[in-house]
Amino acid sequence: MHMAVLGKTGTGKSSLLRHLMAQDIAQDRGFLVLDIHGELTPFILGTVNARERAEHCHLSDRLIVVSPGDREMSVGLNPLEGADDFVRVAEFSQILRERWALDHFGARTDELLRNSLFALAANGLTLLELSLLLTHTEFRAECMKKVANAEVRQYFELRFDTLSDAMRATMREPILNKTSAFTADPAFRHIVGQTHSSFSLREAMDAGAWVVVNLEKGRLGENALTLGSLILTMLKNALFSRAKRTLFTVYCDEIQNFVAQGSGIETMLSEARKFGVAFVAANQFLDQYPAETRAAILSIGTHIFFQLSSADATTISQALDGGKPLAERLKNLPARHAIVKSSSDRWTEIVVPTVLEPKVDYTDLVSRTRYVQSRVRVHIERDIAARQKRYTEISSEALDGWD
């Protein structure tokens, strides 16, 4: 069910992904795409709109677009919503540690981040409240009232709160420095700063929705990868509660950017298959994958190889028992030609058809989709400001709580 795609830039990977997604749209199969460069989003929107026109129907309720670069409106995706079990919180903590390079600050910083995320999740809060939690004693005390996990409460009440101000500052500053760089950017602040997500990934999978995450890393920077990592982790956690097991595909270019080291990608792929979720992972070179991730990717059942570098061609030809002739072919494949190998079959060569972007104006489709899933950013910021003002005003004399 899973598919690994490998090939140099311009050799046909995008044509293959377009072809597969166009088939999914035509046959009502759901998918999520992490569009790291923003190159697939226009094709998807155009293809959905072309189908609407051909069939005289409306499909905006099937389409969900997460677009941090949209300056006017934004969906909400709170990764901490409902994440009040320790395993899920630990996964989010691991993602943030790696994305923000917090590992070298040591175990104390790691423990503080993990327990802080758990406390925020238990209170129905967001990453935006992390600074308040770690700097505002009264706010932290009020949060502890809703934390059922005794170890988390004891960590803050018996350990963190008993430290000197200087020691607490030393522990929290690396976390807050990295967090603020993410949450201060309006492109991402208005997505993760909403207490309630605009949609459920589990329901989107069950309904066969088309979820497009337009990350535009070249324009939005490294924060786009953090958002993509959080969304992929949210999807992983949503797998286990699926009511339906109909096929849902995750298209992910450069997947190594979105999974944490030691997160057990091979386990994720195995579990996803059980719940009807297929991954299509595309990349340019094998050495872009960390060793553990590379092993998991190479164990996927179906591989499609476009033109490869000399080193990768040698490695793959040896794995396929093709020897030097196959290695030479892999190095010299014409554009859109690929070698396909599934687990039980001998490798074969195919030609991927050219898939052109439909020449349609999908502005109305985007407007309808935004109306259903998104909120005006000015309104989101107003809600955030009001919420944080309310929390800041909490004092030790009058802790009114919030519900």
Annotate each predicted stretch with a short phrase.
Residues 6-11, 16-277, 281, 290-292, ...:
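P-loop NTPase motor domains
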